[in-house]
Amino acid sequence: DPEMSRGLGDVYKRQLLALPQFAQERKYSTFYEQRATLFEELPVTSKDIIFLGNSITNGCEWAELFQNKNVKNRGISGDICMGVYDRLDPIVKGKPAKIFLLIGINDVSRGTSADKIISEISMIVRKIKQESPKTKLYLQSVLPVNDCYGMFNGHTSRWQVVKQINDLLEPLAVKEGAAYIDLYSHFVEKETGKMNPVYTNDGLHLLGKGYLLWRDIVKPYVDQK
């Protein structure tokens, strides 16, 4: 479908333009295109439960975690709010039962403000509601980060922005009739405001134990009829 491939071309170009121009990042953007084009070919049905987001979503085996083949992974490493917005079509076209969205930390790493991130998430929410009004939407809070590993400094040095996003995300969910799921408070160390090192080995991504905790938090929402 030339229309669809043209659409993806735009997504890909936007990702490419947004990336710092060095070899590793250029290579990374080819992964984005590989995954986005795969998702365009994989059908979504009204029985499906979609986990949508960036590398943190990308990194999990959701169907195995929930022992449910209708739970589908639509995470792409490196994704940002507008990247998710641009690739909604093949998802909402299938009118999935539920969408669990977790997005924003890569926008934080680019210096984007909490207000701007929320405004872009609200565009995602409105598009889902418009194109697939029966889909139940769950907005998951952005996870805390931890700068003690000296990795992903663009993300982890801006750890305070995460709380600002979450403080605005819950009212957005209420306003738009979506459910808000607070992951943040389960993963954060109260005394530092940073990700509990039990759940990460780089300050940004999750270890197996982190995915099990995430599963335990969202399972009631996944199982809800």
Model-derived features: positions:
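Oxyanion-hole/transition-state-stabilizing segment in secreted/luminal serine hydrolases
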Residues: 52, 57-70, 81-119, 127, ...
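Catalytic His-Asp segment of secreted/periplasmic serine-dependent ester chemistry enzymes
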Residues: 18, 144-225
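Short, structured coil segments at secondary-structure junctions
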Residues: 7, 67-69, 176
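Second-shell loop/turn segments in exported
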Residues: 73-77, 106-114, 155-156, 200-204
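Charged helix-capping and loop-helix junction motifs
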Residues: 114-124, 159-165
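A short helix->loop->beta-strand "cap" motif at the edges of active sites that frequently abuts
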Residues: 132-136
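Single conserved hydrophobic/aromatic residue that forms the stacking wall/gate
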Residues: 1-12
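Serine-esterase "nucleophile elbow" of acetyl-processing enzymes
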Residues: 16-95, 194
